[in-house]
Amino acid sequence: MNESESELQARLLAKALPFMQRYENKTIVVKYGGHAMGNPELGKAFASDIALLKQSGVNPIVVHGGGPQIGAMLNKMGIESKFEGGLRVTDQKTVEIVEMVLAGSINKEIVALINQTGEWAIGLCGKDGNMVFAEKARKTVKDPDSNIERVLDLGFVGEVVEVDRTLLDLLARSEMIPVIAPVAPGRDGATYNINADTFAGAIAGALNATRLLFLTDVAGVLDKNGQLIKELSVAEAHALIADGTISGGMIPKVETCIDAIKAGVQGVVILNGKTAHSVLLEIFTEHGIGTLIVP
């Protein structure tokens, strides 16, 4: 006899119940980015996942990026992107567009998607409620010929120096789901564009989040045979960076995970945001679908 759809849903919910109980009243920060942001169907699936987390008693917080959309808007407005050491230089005109795209357009699109599920999302950035303060990022690059380090001036690219959790604690006690753009003020009065991964890590650390999820375009951390590594300690992650197993763009991602754990996050997961309902599959199944990094 074939299992009906309702019977299948009931069986899946029964399996998920222990995990729902485990995460009840816990904070889960989700960094939303990558391919999933540009796919309408994946966007709807993501919004429904966040809504179900809230309905299950979890306190979800969304932090989002938007690099491709920023680049597209700069091109549309005829502003040429400048790069130093492979990093985008953000001048005054550029940071104004960054804030417009991140805190305006993208943020409100995500808020609208979640609101369409029947839940209440609220769009924020680091400026709201003095939630986050930043300072000018200090980046260096080493000259391959002379081996001398050179300081890069990236303009209004910032690093988080302070997180005030007051507003987020208030929202956690409400029915609201915060959706946060990685833009923050400095004590100098300037506006700074902040890497969304490090911004999410700082938020999660300040809240001592149970989980921080990074939605990416890859399955997670892979071993030398290309197989997914399900769990890593911080020490094991350092060792895999040292021996070259973790390489390229995955290195800064894993280093951000490690920083978040040092800041107080209980566990950080790198997972594939291109998988529909990836958030639920990670949180409400026994083994998850990504790589969990723990202390």
From Swiss-Prot:
Protein name: Acetylglutamate kinase
A biological process term (GO) from this entry: arginine biosynthetic process via ornithine
Substrates-to-products reaction catalysed: N-acetyl-L-glutamate + ATP = N-acetyl-L-glutamyl 5-phosphate + ADP
NCBIfam families membership: argB (TIGR00761)
EC number(s) recorded for this UniProt protein: 2.7.2.8
Organism annotation: Rhizobium leguminosarum bv. trifolii (strain WSM2304)
Keyword terms of this UniProt record: Amino-acid biosynthesis, Arginine biosynthesis, ATP-binding, Cytoplasm, Kinase, Nucleotide-binding, Transferase
Gene that encodes the chain: argB
Annotated site location: Transition state stabilizer: K31, K253
